[in-house]
Amino acid sequence: MTPADLATLIKETAVEVLTSRELDTSVLPEQVVVERPRNPEHGDYATNIALQVAKKVGQNPRDLATWLAEALAADDAIDSAEIAGPGFLNIRLAAAAQGEIVAKILAQGETFGNSDHLSHLDVNLEFVSANPTGPIHLGGTRWAAVGDSLGRVLEASGAKVTREYYFNDHGRQIDRFALSLLAAAKGEPTPEDGYGGEYIKEIAEAIVEKHPEALALEPAATQELFRAEGVEMMFEHIKSSLHEFGTDFDVYYHENSLFESGAVDKAVQVLKDNGNLYENEGAWWLRSTEFGDDKDRVVIKSDGDAAYIAGDIAYVADKFSRGHNLNIYMLGADHHGYIARLKAAAAALGYKPEGVEVLIGQMVNLLRDGKAVRMSKRAGTVVTLDDLVEAIGIDAARYSLIRSSVDSSLDIDLGLWESQSSDNPVYYVQYGHARLCSIARKAETLGVTEEGADLSLLTHDREGDLIRTLGEFPAVVKAAADLREPHRIARYAEELAGTFHRFYDSCHILPKVDEDTAPIHTARLALAAATRQTLANALHLVGVSAPEKM
């Protein structure tokens, strides 16, 4: 019985108790909250349902808790239900009911933890979207890991997810990039406000090698050649780096296509027609303050050029027109103002603003021996996705970026993540999985299987701790999806690995050399198999491998 199963049982019992006393059942919460007590001596689970509804039905909380406890104790799945304090219920599961969690995991396999509670969502998940003017820096790398994991978590919760990369190939930064490449090809200094670094020289050399005539063309033609080839080469490098990192996209959307297709003009006309765009001093302004923004925004400047937000507006419209009812933007720390801006754009176009969500990720700092490794695309000392992977490997890189909330800045200590010790979180979790695989191999050698296991034998405290931790996984996945917080999966994996290691140290899973196989060995092997499956499922959701040997 998982916590969710217990919550359902408690609610059904509460309905019966209230109905039998002719009390109003409509006051019951839609979802009964079940938690693990801080002190294990208080039981397996606790609920405050009696405190929640007692006043609403005109009853003393302890009296209501007493009625509920008596009714619950009569159920075969419940070993005991005791009242604590003003009306809390502390519940212990019967051993057989607790063991049901293990059986459920083994039956569901790779789908354990999945649900369909977000099946109503068609999600456009846009992340990374780094400018094609340089390699992906650490901030973009964080989104590459977190965004991919969030997509996995949303899909595990039933949502349809389209992973999208917005390719910023329209704007002055591309011109600066082209001029930087051209200067490098000519052996000239980097232009003011241009891009520097070895990658600029490498791309420039590749362009000249591919087009020996490049520098002999007319200046405008030369610049256009370096622009087109440079952007294409840089973008191919970005896509290759992301693929090697385990992050792939369904759609690569070119910003320039919004202008070439007339989508920007169409969106502007829609806003003019519905009165949400007005003219002032020769410019056209979005009435964004009417939709929650802190100021109205210029969409078309007085010189007739489109402001940057014009592309954003057209892009919002395009996403909704493709059938997405939830559009998630994962943006950097310097984009906080975009939250109100994008929601206002959606509302002004006639779409539901709640169909736009903006997640803001904070900066990433790389440390070596306690000293910061600086990153600066223009100074040529950029620390990239490739650099991080080369330093600590793909699994450690992804895990280090995912396990913390994106709301806070992140320091990555290279020494910690390079280490093969329990201090390294990803090593600790992966080692747990590898140890479980080793147990399975040894069991096969001994001819021990989990078939026909009597799971009611799992009554040791460490066994109970492990089973209850396993039972929490579906709720963790649900919370990670609902709150858009995949770091919850990583933290859960660490908790599960730790709980397993403590179980392993206290309970002999397989028979010793001089022992015959007993029913407890079979039951513990089943528990180990369920733990292995759940750890593998968690690691999959964060896009990290589950090694069988280490």
UniProtKB/Swiss-Prot annotation:
One of its GO terms (molecular function) is arginine-tRNA ligase activity. It is found in: Cytoplasm. InterPro entries: aa-tRNA-synth_I_CS (IPR001412), Arg-tRNA-ligase (IPR001278), Arg-tRNA-synth_N (IPR005148), Arg-tRNA-synth_N_sf (IPR036695), ArgRS_core (IPR035684), DALR_anticod-bd (IPR008909), Rossmann-like_a/b/a_fold (IPR014729), tRNAsynth_Ia_anticodon-bd (IPR009080). Keywords: Aminoacyl-tRNA synthetase, ATP-binding, Cytoplasm, Ligase, Nucleotide-binding, Protein biosynthesis. It comes from the Bacteria. One of its GO terms (biological process) is arginyl-tRNA aminoacylation. A motif ('HIGH' region) lies at residues 130-140. One of its GO terms (cellular component) is cytoplasm. Its EC number is 6.1.1.19. It catalyses: tRNA(Arg) + L-arginine + ATP = L-arginyl-tRNA(Arg) + AMP + diphosphate. The keyword Protein biosynthesis applies. Induction: Up-regulated by arginine and repressed by lysine. Belongs to the class-I aminoacyl-tRNA synthetase family. Monomer. This is Arginine--tRNA ligase. It comes from Corynebacterium glutamicum (strain ATCC 13032 / DSM 20300 / JCM 1318 / BCRC 11384 / CCUG 27702 / LMG 3730 / NBRC 12168 / NCIMB 10025 / NRRL B-2784 / 534).
